[in-house]
Amino acid sequence: MTSTKDKIEKLRKILLKYEYFYHTLNQSIISDAEYDYLFRQLYELELKHKELIPSDSPTQKVGSHILQKFKKIKHFSPMLSLENTFDVNGYLNFKKRIKKSIHNNEPLSFCCELKLDGVAISIIYEEGIFVRAATRGDGFEGENITSNARMIDSIPLKLKGIDIPKRLEIRGEVFMLKSNFIKLNKKYKLNQNKYFSNPRNAAAGSLRHIDPNITAERKLIFSCHGCDFFVKTNKELTTHYQRLMKCLSWGIPVNKEIVICSSDIEIIQFYKKIAQKRNFLDFDIDGIVIKVNSLELQKKIGSTTKSPRWAIAFKFSPKERITTLNDVKFQVGRTGVITPVAYFNPVYISGVMISKASLHNKNEIERLNLHFNDTITICRSGDVIPRLLNVIEIRRCDNAKKIIFPSFCPVCNTELLENIEEKLIRCHSGLTCDAQKKQALYHFFSKKSLYVVGLGPKIINELVEKGLVKNPIDFFYLKDIDLIQLKNVGKRKSIKIINSIKKCKKTTLKCFIYALGIPGVGEVVAGKIANYFIKLDKLMNSNILELNCISGVGKIISNNIFNYFSTISNREMVVKLIKQAGIFLNDQEIHKINSEKTYFFNKKIVLTGVFKSFSRIELKTILLSLGAKISNNISRKTDFLIYGNNFGSKFFRAKDLDVKIINQEELNSLIRIKE
């Protein structure tokens, strides 16, 4: 038994050594075939002597049980995101802020690293043994991915070396090599499976796969970018760089592209160097990360609830690619606006395959002087939105055909009219244009309008195409037998939709105005109009002068409202919706008087978390009916933050700003007081 135990231990040490060289030092000192042979030997020996298998054995990275679900796990300290900048001025402003928060005579150096485009995770080691791993999640709570993280070869299950803390937290990125990503997608295409759009998505999907064995097959890579010692056993480590090097000595992978910079010139030179190397790397990066190197200064500078003040991501300018323009299609929006969209040969930019980009309006087509088959330059603004930058006219063929903005609607063939003030071209045929009809109907029954559960774009499109509906009125006469003939609509779903249509008849003037889809009239403007006119008939009979008196409603929107109710077909439809379809508008005058008496009247409120008693939309509706103003962002002007379970960073931001915080029980009590 002793000789077998020694042999097992020897094989483990050899394999762990090879893994360290390969994954941490990027050195291959053994062939794949030799490694597989040694691995098989160890596997077979451990299979016969299961009592000798430790948790850090190389064999424990395969054959794990299949997870049923991922449980939530709280981080020991928040996993914050980074502030971003795309230019030198942004970096200089960041440095200026740091100088203000410390004494100017203190030496200041920065640790500069690659900003890997991967999935952020946290790993905990106790006594040098891997015990758990979690995704970032919302920064305060992530998913327990321990079983899957064990399958990543570059994550050591047992640390080596000396001075290992009793408890250690490692933070870093999990990513997939571009070469492995291409192989994975080829495999998926052969099996006719849905493939991944970019390496980051592939890494995220693989890391959260229900079967850890699949995670193991995907060849994910981990790279450390930070750590924390819960028991301060390494007092000699005073800088971020020293910590990273210590992690490397323990066998934790750290990317080799790290420099210490003491001047602006050094940082900019490093940024330019990495920008030039970017396209030649086998993994995606989207910039560099600049961190104050001194741990003492990091602590002194501190963090906001969202990001550390001592670090910033200096992102690359949008990447550009040259491709060929194939076509420009003219789309018709809900309000009749014609939007040109360019279609071109697909190009891969910043990890995403792009084949189309909005051209916004007629002016943009004229600016670019577009012709069919033009050679064009494409980029992603902010590494997100596809944009056609310019045309390389020198490559244009002599007989190239110029792209002309249409004079008639591409869907209904109605003559288009140009609004010079708005810089827009519209089809004014309204609901007689199928493209506008479909989108207008979806808007009419959307969540912020007269919400009907289950009535999505696919069902509405099919109802229009089958001639079952032509305008909103027709929906109130639908029967379940009409819906059953549609794709994927059974008896139960049809009844659910019909019942929801009946319920949506009772609404507010604000929701009704918004549902009409008048150009420029969003949710906020609809509320202002409702509060000003109080009654629908007053709005319908208003003139331009009255409309211009409404605060926040400009000349263009006033004209749009006046033109809408001046159109006979629109007026007839509104009257039929009220008198025939039976839409009932809550009395706005009584609502306004009552809302002024409530605790929430005219208060700016922000919501965060999940609420027990009602959905987010229901709660917003209740608060708005009480005269509240709902906002998405916390500021010093916020009156209340109302929070539920699993609240996010807004809660801590509110505390920092001394904003009054209301929990679910207090909220229920306040709502009952009103009632």
Swiss-Prot record:
Binding-site residues, Zn(2+): 409, 412, 427, 433
Active site: 115 (n6-amp-lysine intermediate)
A single GO BP: DNA replication
Cofactor or coenzyme needed: Mg(2+); Mn(2+)
SUPFAM superfamilies, alphabetized: BRCT domain (SSF52113), DNA ligase/mRNA capping enzyme, catalytic domain (SSF56091), Nucleic acid-binding proteins (SSF50249), RuvA domain 2-like (SSF47781)
Matching SMART domains: BRCT, HhH1, LIGANc
Superkingdom of origin: Bacteria
Residues reported in the UniProt entry to bind NAD(+): 32-36, 81-82, 113, 136, 173, 291, 315
Enzyme Commission number(s) from the entry: 6.5.1.2
Gene3D superfamilies referenced in this protein's UniProt entry, alphabetically: 5' to 3' exonuclease, C-terminal subdomain, 6.20.10.30, BRCT domain, DNA ligase/mRNA capping enzyme, Helix hairpin bin, Nucleic acid-binding proteins
Top-level class of the enzyme under EC nomenclature: ligase
Domain BRCT span(s) in chain numbering: 595-675
Keywords: DNA damage, DNA repair, DNA replication, Ligase, Magnesium, Manganese, Metal-binding, NAD, Zinc
One Gene Ontology term of the molecular function aspect: DNA ligase (NAD+) activity
Classification via InterPro entries: BRCT_dom (IPR001357), BRCT_dom_sf (IPR036420), DisA/LigA_HHH (IPR041663), DNA_ligase (IPR001679), DNA_ligase_AS (IPR018239), DNA_ligase_CS (IPR033136), DNAligase_adenylation (IPR013839), DNAligase_N (IPR013840)
GO cellular component: cytosol
Catalyzed reaction equations: NAD(+) + (deoxyribonucleotide)n-3'-hydroxyl + 5'-phospho-(deoxyribonucleotide)m = (deoxyribonucleotide)n+m + AMP + beta-nicotinamide D-nucleotide
Known role: DNA ligase that catalyzes the formation of phosphodiester linkages between 5'-phosphoryl and 3'-hydroxyl groups in double-stranded DNA using NAD as a coenzyme and as the energy source for the reaction. It is essential for DNA replication and repair of damaged DNA.
Protein family membership: Belongs to the NAD-dependent DNA ligase family. LigA subfamily.
UniProt protein name: DNA ligase
Gene (name only): ligA
